[in-house]
Amino acid sequence: MIRKYLAMTAIMLSCVIMLALSSCNLTITDKDKFYVDENHRLTKIDLEKTGPDIVVPEKVGDNVIRRISLYDRYFSKIDTIDVSNVSELEFFKLNLLDDSNYSKLKMLDFSKNKKLRTVGVNRTKALEEVVFNKSCRSVLLFNTSIKKIDLNVLENMEHFTYFNGPLEDVDFSNNINLEQLHIGNANVKSVDIKMLKKLKNFGCYGVCLDEFDISNNPDLETIEVFNTNVKVLDVSNNPKLKKIEVDEGTEIIGETNAEIKYWTKEDIEKMKKRLEEN
C-alpha cells in the first residue's frame, strides 16, 4: 500500500514538474520577439509573437537599442509601432519593399526620441503623418501618403528628401541649417528656399513649378530642376555652382563654369521607367 502511495506521489510530482516546465516554455520574453545585433540594431521582429501593434522596448536583455533597421515586406503587417520607450534611439529606417499597398501604418511619432538623428521610410503607402523630434538631422521620405508635413522644430536638419507622394505644401523657413534638399514627384506648386543660405545641393523634379529663385543661396553647388515648368534659371548669384541639370530649352541667365546637363523628354521617360522597375 505504501509502495502504491509512493508510486502515485512520484507520478503526480512528475506531472507537476512537467507542467511547470511547459509553463516556463510558454513565457514569451523580449528576446523571443525582438532581435538586436551586436551593433545595437533592431533588425527583426517576430510579428507572430508581438501582433501588429508593436511596442519596442528600450533594450532587449542587456542590449540597448540605438538603431532600428527594418527592411522586408514582412513588416507590412505592422499596424502601429511605438518607439517612445527607446530613449537611446539614433537611427530609424523602415522599408517595406514591394508590399507597400498592404501596409496600415498611418503615423510615426518620434517626439520622445531626443537622440534621434536619422529617419528614413520607404514604401509605407498608408503613412500620413510623422511627428519629429528637434534632434533630427536627416529626413528621407519615399513612397508615402504624406500631404503636409511640419518641419518647424527641425532647426538643425541638414538633409531632407521627399519622393513620390502627394505632398502639397512644405515650409522650410525654420530649417536654416539645411544643406541638401530634394523633392521629386510631388504636388507642391512652389518651393521657397530663400532662407536656406547654407544649401549646397538642391533637386526638384516631377513637380509643377513655374519659376524658381536661387538668388539667396550663395553656397549652392548642384541644382537639378527638370521635368518642371521652369523656363528660366538665374544663376548670377551662385558662384560655387559645379553642376546644373535642367529641362531642354531652359534659359540659364548669368555666367557660370558649372557643368550643364539638359534633360530631354526621352531622358525623363527612361528615368520614369527605371524608377517603376525599381
Which stretches of residues belong to each language-model region?
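N-terminal capping/linker segments that flank leucine-rich repeat
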Residues: I2-F91, D98, S103, D109-K114, ...
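Residue-level signal for tight coil/turn positions that link beta-strands
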Residues: E38-H40, K134-C136, N164, G206, ...
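Conserved hydrophobic beta-strand positions in leucine-rich repeat
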Residues: I68, I81, F92-N95, L108, ...
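Per-repeat beta-strand-to-loop junction in leucine-rich repeat
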Residues: Y71, N95, S111, N122-R123, ...
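Canonical position 11/12 of the leucine-rich repeat
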Residues: F75-D79, Y102-K106, K125-E128, S145-K147, ...
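Intrinsically disordered low-complexity segments with strong compositional bias
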Residues: R137, D150, N156, D171, ...
